[in-house]
Amino acid sequence: MSSEPPPRRARGPGEEQNMTEIDAFPRREIFDPTEKYKMDHKRRGIALIFNHERFFWHLTLPNRPGTSADRDNLRRRFSDLGFEVKCFDDLRAEELLLKIHEASTASHVDADCFLCVFLSHGEGNHIYAYDAKIEIQTLTGLFKGDKCQSLVGKPKIFIIQACRGSQHDVPVIPLDVVDHRTDTPDANLTQVDAASVYTLPAGADFLMCYSVAEGYYSHRETVNGSWYIQDLCEMLGKFGSSLEFTELLTLVNRKVSQRRVDFCRDPNAIGKKQVPCFASMLTKKLHFSPKSK
């Protein structure tokens, strides 16, 4: 009996060849699950922090006391990791877009990555500048490969601490401190904000970090800053140069989710919790190893 395989049947009219699209691309010989992003360029990269505490009156958005603590905390932590940190306060939408455009058209050839933080109110797929809202995808889109060639294949990290300023902005007075006084200007009040910023995909090598997942609440203390940024900065201080970054973000999720409002004068705020989230389009492991001097 012949061992030869039977001849292939000729395709009839209208029949298409069964071929996967990936066959058109060269295959990698070795797939390394431990592969890391190259983080030994001349410089770490730029970290932009857009901080918004006050807003144009016509937007009817409340101020965000405590956000300057977030800004300063982030500036210290990212500087420690080797970033060139640039902070901007209460920019108008046109000014903010100009700064983003300048960053996207700058050369990042000798940089490891790019990082951008927004501290503001948010709604849907927008965040608020001083005088208008801006679509998040408008901002991230400027850093995609066709717009920003020098960041192709490099991590692009966006951190969004955005909470909705509406009827859910309930001041919560912590009563678990013996000497707490609500009539002092420095009282550290907690504000409970409804989550309303959608998690949006951005593209390959993007990492989108959100202070709160949809359906939960975002908390910001008027003196110490937001829960999310407080815990993010604590984890960056402890593990920023040693732990893989998405693993660090998972620790942040855990720490924030363990917080709760236990004692307050508003009974509706008791038990409110917060769960951050991140959407990773990274293709390799991300480590902020110390830069050599």
Swiss-Prot record:
Top-level lineage group: Eukaryota
Prodomain residues: 1-23, 180-193
Keyword Nucleus: yes
Disulfide bridges in this chain: none
Lipid addition sites, S-palmitoyl cysteine: C264, C277
GO cellular component, one term: cytoplasm
Single GO term (MF): cysteine-type endopeptidase activity
Compartments, as annotated in UniProt: Cytoplasm; Nucleus
Keyword line: Apoptosis, Autocatalytic cleavage, Cytoplasm, Hydrolase, Lipoprotein, Nucleus, Palmitate, Phosphoprotein, Protease, Thiol protease, Zymogen
Catalytic activity annotation: Strict requirement for Asp at position P1 and has a preferred cleavage sequence of Val-Glu-His-Asp-|-
Sequence positions bearing Phosphoserine: S79, S257
Region of interest (Tri-arginine exosite), ranges: 42-44
Residue segments, region 130's region: 125-142
InterPro entries: Caspase-like_dom_sf, Caspase_cys_AS, Caspase_his_AS, Pept_C14, Pept_C14_caspase, Pept_C14_p10, Pept_C14_p20, Pept_C14A
Family per similarity comment: Belongs to the peptidase C14A family.
Biological role stated in the UniProt entry: Cysteine protease that plays essential roles in programmed cell death, axonal degeneration, development and innate immunity. Acts as a non-canonical executioner caspase during apoptosis: localizes in the nucleus and cleaves the nuclear structural protein NUMA1 and lamin A/LMNA thereby inducing nuclear shrinkage and fragmentation. Lamin-A/LMNA cleavage is required for chromatin condensation and nuclear disassembly during apoptotic execution.
Written domain comment of the UniProt record: The N-terminal disordered prodomain is required to prevent self-activation. The Tri-arginine exosite is required to recruit substrates for hydrolysis.
Protein name, as recorded: Caspase-6
Organism name: Bos taurus (Bovine)
